[in-house]
Amino acid sequence: SIVLFCLLCSCARIPAKLPEQTSNSTTETSAVYTPKPDEIRAVWISCYELPDAAQGEEKFRERAEEMFNNVADMKLNTVFVHVRAFADAVYPSKLFPWSKYSCKGSDPGFDPLKVMVECAHRAGLKIHAWINPFRVSSSDNIDSLPQGSPAKKLIGTDTVIQLKNGIYFDPASTDVHALIYDGVREILDGYEVDGIHIDDYFYPTRDESIDRAEYEAYVSGGGDKGLNEWRRDSVSAFAA
């Protein structure tokens, strides 16, 4: 995923002293940024930086408005808002449990994503729903997964990968792909977002054992690509 970062200089006042000038003489110049058509000037807002939905809709809305107005004041035009960091959601979902970050793992009594879409558009910004498709948890403890997590139902199958640094969905699994696509469709059908931003869609390890059964099935079916190329193709097939 690629984001264009732009250094914006708005009305920068630059004093310049020439040799023939006296110490009391200065020259001021002004650099004014002129936006280009269709240019994306974006900022990521991670799950750790979202307003606290547990404090209620009014305070959440106030904080969201403040954040997005600040973004607009910096001459940016797009926000990538983290709506799914760990197989969760910051909106009422039929597929994923409430996020433990902004939503503290339970229904806050309102729809945070709906509020953020409204606030972003009111500030003149485009808003993309940012998801991490394969991350399930930063902990390897299965018991730490919330009730309703789709990964919890799949533990022990080839669909979920459990490592020392966390739990992940198998990037090669077509069942995983279907789940992620359904999650994206849920967002597109329910919210007037301007895009979907997919980040961190890679294999969590080089360990050859995590998808051995799937790779062997591929080879048995006549596949002739090496493991690394097959894995790259699996991710490409997902993203396509």
Segments and roles (model prediction):
Residues 7-10:
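C-terminal motif of bacterial Sec signal peptides marking the signal peptidase cleavage site
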Residues 12-19:
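Bacterial lipoprotein signal-peptidase II cleavage site
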Residues 34-61, 128-191:
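Active-site-adjacent "subsite" loops/lids of carbohydrate-active enzymes
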Residues 41-45, 77-82, 126-130, 195-199:
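Structural recognition of the beta-strand scaffold that forms the well-ordered cores
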Residues 62-89, 190-195:
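Catalytic domains of carbohydrate-active enzymes, especially glycoside hydrolases
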Residues 71, 79, 120, 127, ...:
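Conserved, mostly hydrophobic/aromatic
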Residues 114, 154-240:
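Polysaccharide-binding and catalytic clefts of secreted carbohydrate-active enzymes
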